[in-house]
């Protein structure tokens, strides 16, 4: 039989402390999520002729295109530059999200992965 306040099998521990820690982590994750949602992440492509900005909510908020990038005979190139800049901005957002999660979980390996 487990000792009072421990885990089955005699593993020591205090369930109340674990619950408090989990609640604290949840609160921190919610705070970090709110902070992340207010940030913007920008990336450029084509030497800066295309710039895309996304929010922490992973929504495109701005696209800037230098007029010199607009070639009616090569629309596909412009499309590729927009895609590249968008993907890079989203990658930066995800990188920041993972870094924030690692601060909270202390590197507990994927705990809550994908929450941000």
Curated annotation (Swiss-Prot):
It holds the Pfam family YbaB_DNA_bd. InterPro entries: YbaB-like_sf, YbaB/EbfC. GO terms for molecular function: DNA binding. The keyword DNA-binding applies. Residues 1-42 are annotated as: Disordered. Residues 1-12 have a biased composition (Gly residues). Residues 13-26 have a biased composition (Low complexity). Keywords: Cytoplasm, DNA-binding. One of its GO terms (cellular component) is cytosol. NCBIfam families: DNA_YbaB_EbfC. Binds to DNA and alters its conformation. May be involved in regulation of gene expression, nucleoid organization and DNA protection. Belongs to the YbaB/EbfC family. Homodimer. This is Nucleoid-associated protein EUBELI_02017. The lineage of its organism: Bacteria, Bacillati, Bacillota, Clostridia, Lachnospirales.
């Amino acid at each position: 039989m487990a000792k009072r306040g421990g885990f089955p099998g005699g593993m020591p521990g205090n369930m109340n402390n674990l619950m408090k820690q989990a609640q604290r982590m949840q609160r921190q994750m919610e705070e970090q999520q709110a902070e992340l949602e207010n940030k913007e992440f920008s990336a450029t492509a084509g030497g800066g002729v295309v710039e895309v900005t996304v929010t922490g909510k992973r929504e495109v908020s701005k696209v800037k295109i230098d007029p010199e990038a607009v070639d009616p005979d090569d629309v596909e190139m412009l499309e590729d530059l927009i895609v590249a800049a968008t993907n890079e901005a989203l990658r930066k957002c995800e990188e920041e999200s993972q870094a924030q999660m690692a601060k909270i979980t202390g590197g507990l390996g994927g705990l809550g992965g994908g929450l941000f």
